[in-house]
Amino acid sequence: MNVSATKDVYKTSRFFYILEAAFEYFISILVTGAYLAKVTEAIGISDTLTGILTAFVSLGCGFQIIAIFLANKHPVKRWVTILHSVNQLVFALIYLVPFIPLTREQKTIVFVVFLLLGHIINNIVHAPKINWFMSLVDDKKRGSFTASKEMVSLIGGMVFSFVMGFVIDEFEAAGDLNGAFAVCGISVVVLMLLHSSTLLFSKEKPCEQKEIVPTKQLLGEFIKDKNLFKVILVAVLWNVVNYSATPFYGSYQIKELGFTMTFVSVTSAAYAVIRASCSKPLGKFADKHSFVNMLNICFTIAFVSFAGNVFAVPSNGKFLFTATYMLYAVAMAGINSSTINLIYDYVDPEKRMGALALSGALSGFAGFFTTLAVSPLVTFIQENGNTFLGISMYAQQLVSAIAATLLLVLLVYLNVVVKKLKNKRKDDVAVDEMPSNGAILVDVNNKEQE
C-alpha cells in the first residue's frame, strides 16, 4: 500500500482555515459597530456621516467583482496573503487617527480613507481566499467542515467581544479613552500577525486547469452560464428576504418591546450558542442529503420565525420574539454557509472564484437596497401612529409579513429551479435522496435530480 498516496497533506491547512476565519472575525468586531462608533465620536464625526460611512462600507461588496478578473492569477496564496495583511494593517491605523495632530476635518478625511481602503482590499481578496481554502475540503465533508468553522468563530467571537468590552470599559471608567484606542489598535495588529501566519503556513492545491483560459474567454463563458446565475440568485433572494425585516428588529426590541440591554445581551449569547450547536448536525445532514434539502429545512424554520414575529407585540414580545429569534438562530446555522456550498455543488471549478465574487457583490447590493426601499414604509407607519391602511400595527409586524411572503417565493424557486440542476459533487452520495420522515417542506418538483 502506498502510504504517501493516501496521506492527507491538506489536513493542517484546513485547521489553519478555521483559525483564519476566527481571527478575521475578531478583527471585524473591532472595526465595526460600537467600537467604530467610539472612534468616530472621539474624532468628532457626526452620527449622520457615521451612518453614511456604514452604508458605503456595506456597498464595498461591489469590489468583490474585481476577483472575476483575477481568475487566472494562480497561485493565489502570495498575493492574497500580502493584500489581506495590508487591509488589516490599514484597519489598525484607524485607531491611530485620534492621536494624529490634525484638525477635525483632516482627521475625518484620513479616517474615511483608512476605513474605505481597508474594506475595498478585503472585498477584493474575499472570493479568491475562500476558493483557495474550500478547494482543500472533501466534497463529502463540506457541510460538516463549514459548520465546525462557524462554531469556532461564533463561540470565539462571543468570548473575544466580552473580554474586549470589559477591557475597554475599564479604560473608559479610568478616563483613559486614548488607552482604550491603543489597546484596540495593538489587538488588531496582533490578530493581523496571527491571521497572516495561518495564510503563510497553509498549502494551496495546484490549479486543476491544464491550460489557462484567456480572461476574456472565461468572462464570456461565465456570462453565458445560466445555471451559475440560477444558483447565485438563491443568495440574492435570501438577502432580499433577510434585509427586508431584520435591520429593523434592533430598535423594535429596545423601543416598542421594552427589552433591557441586559436581556438583549442574554438573548444574543443564547443565539450564538444555539446557532453554533445546530451548525454541525445541519452540516452533516447536508453532506448526506444535499445542501438544497438542508436549505428546505432552514428556510422553512426561518419562515416560521418571520411569521411568528408578525404576532410579536409588547404584551407577548418577551416570550414570542425571543422564541422566534432562537428559531432564526437555528435557521442561520444552515443558511449562512449554504451560499458558498451551493456554488461548490453546482458551478464548474474554473468558474467558482468568479461565482463567489459575483454572489457576494449582488447579494450585498440586494440587501442594502432592500433595506433602503423598505425604510420609507417603516417611517410612514411610525409617523402615522403605528397604523397602516387603517389597521393598528407596528412597522416591524408588517415587514415580518413581507419577509415571510418573500421567503415562500424563495422556497418555491429553490425546489422548482435549483433542484433540477446537475450536481457536480465528486462523490457517489444520492444527493437528492431525503428520508420522508425528515421532510418539512413538500418537494413541489417531485422529480429526481439529473
Each language-model region and where it sits:
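Helix-loop boundary and gating motifs at the non-cytosolic
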Residues: M1-Q64, I68-A71, N87, A92-Y95, ...
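Transmembrane alpha-helix termini and helix-breaking/packing motifs in multi-pass membrane transporters
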Residues: A42, F69, K73, Y95-L102, ...
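Intracellular juxtamembrane helix-capping segments at the cytosolic ends
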Residues: N122-V137, G334-D348
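Hydrophobic core of transmembrane alpha-helices in multi-pass small-molecule transporters
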Residues: A22, V90, E105-V125, K318-I335
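Juxtamembrane intracellular "pre-TM" segments in multi-pass secondary transporters
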Residues: M1-K11, E204-L233, K424-E450
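Helix-to-loop junctions at the C-terminal end of transmembrane segments
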Residues: F63-R78, C278-F291, V378
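Loop-to-transmembrane helix entry/capping segments in MFS-fold secondary transporters
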Residues: D47, D139-K149, M261-T262, P349-G360
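C-terminal ends and interior cores of transmembrane alpha-helices
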Residues: S85-E105, T300-N316
